[in-house]
């Protein structure tokens, strides 16, 4: 039987602003999200016994319940007519890294299941199902540059598209608490969301300089709280900003992965080599983001 394969690219929050905390405890955000060329790979073998296997450089970092197993179980219980099967995950991205690794994997799994389902998949509300798995899963299901608001459920296209950025992704591979993201949001102490709040529309960028200017203004509201939880973030940002030709450096999501933007793919590759030599225990990957 034919197998189905999907790439699960790293999700990068080019900007992340927290609008406030809702009465239900969730935080409303606005974030410009794009995707890198680095990522995991999800393969589905339809018809085989339902199972999940994992390989890759970060396979041993996955422990406890896995979002892919949960997705398969939920689909089997709510959409009995859809095919499932054996799933293999090639885990190339660091875990709990702020680049949506688990969410990207879940989004890729839903895409392969949608492809394998044929016409039966047309009856499934994949966006709604993605949201039940996590706030970042809907944008990772789409796996393209989008403007994300609400808790992650509202997605809008970027008018005229997003200029490509030449970047380096860096993760210090520090010990990260299992409740990292919850700790970061607790430490943020965001104000209560105003009753009249309405998310702004998706931004428009005339060129790459306009995009970088927008990123510098918006930044990442989680960065100070995230660095308090994982202090190594400070060292990563310092290493990035010390590099020749660096144009911008920031934290993605709740971290600890950071990214630096460079004027060309060649400059990004040189930065990757320099960082890998200076910090051999870090995960470093040059990648276009778009």
What residues fall within each predicted segment?
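Conserved, helical-rich catalytic subdomain that frames metal- and/or nucleotide-binding sites
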Residues: 142, 147-248, 263-266, 273-276, ...
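ATP-binding N-lobe of GHMP and related small-molecule kinases
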Residues: 1-97, 115-124, 171, 177
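Short, basic/glycine-rich phosphate-binding loops at helix/coil junctions
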Residues: 48-61, 109, 131, 210-219, ...
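DPxDG-like acidic metal-binding loop motif
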Residues: 97-123, 139-141
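Short hydrophobic/aromatic beta-strand micro-patches
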Residues: 259-261
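Phosphate-handling active-site elements
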Residues: 77-88, 111-133, 264-277
